[in-house]
Amino acid sequence: SVMTPTPGMLPQQIATISFNVANMDVYPPEAYHNSVYFVGPCFAPKQLLMPSARSIPSSPVSLSFRSMDFSPSVSTATTPVGADGFLEKQMLSAHAVAQMQDPVKIWMDRAMTENKRILYINMGSIFFYSLEDYNNILHALEILHKEVPDVLVLWKVSNHPKNVQPIPTVEEADLPSYIRREHWIPDVEVVLSHPSLAASMHHGGGNSYNEALAHGVPQFCVSQWVDTHDIGLYITHSGIGLWADQSPKFDPTDISTKLVRLLQTDYKTFRHAALSWKLKCIQAGGTAGAVEIIENLLRSYDFVNNDSKAPFPDAI
C-alpha cells in the first residue's frame, strides 16, 4: 500500500507493509500501529523485466530471489548453476542492445552533451487529455522555455482515439524543438536515472511518485483524482517538489511559475531534498526488506488447519 491502511481491516491481518518511507506523509511514525512496516518503494527484480520472450531459454529456469539485488538502479542476478552464465549473459546483452537502440536515451545523451537539462512529463497511461488541457500545458511550457531556456521537455502522451482524446497527433502537432513527444517510453528507468534529467511532472500516481522518489528526482504534481491529491501533499511536505495550486486544472500561470521555481530558483534545494529521500528509500529496505518481513511473519504464525485464509487468533 502507498496509502497506509488502518490495521485490523481483515480478520487475517497481522501486519501492514507500506511502500511509503517513514515521515514521508504528514503523520509521524509513532502515529501508526507497531504492526505497520515502512519499506519504501519496491520494484520487481530488474533482470526479470529486461529480455523479450525470444531471449529466454525454452527450458524452465528457477530463479533465486534471495540472491537478487532489488535496487532500481543496480542490476545483478544469480541463477542455479545450470543456467547461471547463459541466462545472465542473455539478459544483460538484451538490455545493453535495447539501450543502444533506444531513441529516447540517444536524445537524452545528446541533450547532456549540449548542456541541456530535461523535464519529464507523464500524466499516466489512463489519463486522457482534453484539447484545453493539452494547449494549457503547451502554453506553460512556452513560458518555461523563455524563463529557463536550457530545459528541454520529454512529454509522454499515450495514444487514444480522438473521440476520447481530441488532440493533434505527433505529426499534426508541429511542436517546438525543445519538446519531444512520445506515446510510449521503452524504459522508464533509463529516463529517471539519466544524468540530464532535472525533474518529473506527473499526476500523483503511485508508480510515478515512487519511481521518481527512488531515483532522487525532484517532482511537480498536478494531481487528478482520489489518492493523487494525497501524494501531492507528500511531495510538498517532504520538500522534494511542488504541487499545483489549481489541481486538477492545468493553469498555465500556475504550472509555469511552479516549474520555474523547481527548475531554476530553488532547484538545488529540491534536488538535495530528493537525493536525501532517495537514500532514505534505500535505508528503508525496499523489496528485499519486504521479503524479510513477510518470511519472518510466515515463520512466526501457525495457520489454523494449514489455511492461510483462516482468521488468526492473535490478529490485530
What is each model feature region?
Residues 1-150, 162-177, 272, 276-279, ...:
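Nucleotide-sugar-dependent glycosyltransferase catalytic domains
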Residues 43-44, 224-227, 247-249:
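Short, acidic/turn-prone active-site loops that include or flank metal/cofactor-
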Residues 152-158:
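Short internal beta-strands
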Residues 155, 220-222, 242-244:
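Short hydrophobic alpha-helical runs that function as membrane-insertion/retention elements
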Residues 176-184:
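Active-site donor-binding acidic/aromatic loop of nucleotide-activated sugar
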Residues 184-235:
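A donor-sugar binding/catalytic signature common to diverse glycosyltransferases
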Residues 237, 241-242, 247-248, 252, ...:
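Conserved donor-nucleotide binding/catalytic region of nucleotide-linked donor-dependent transferases
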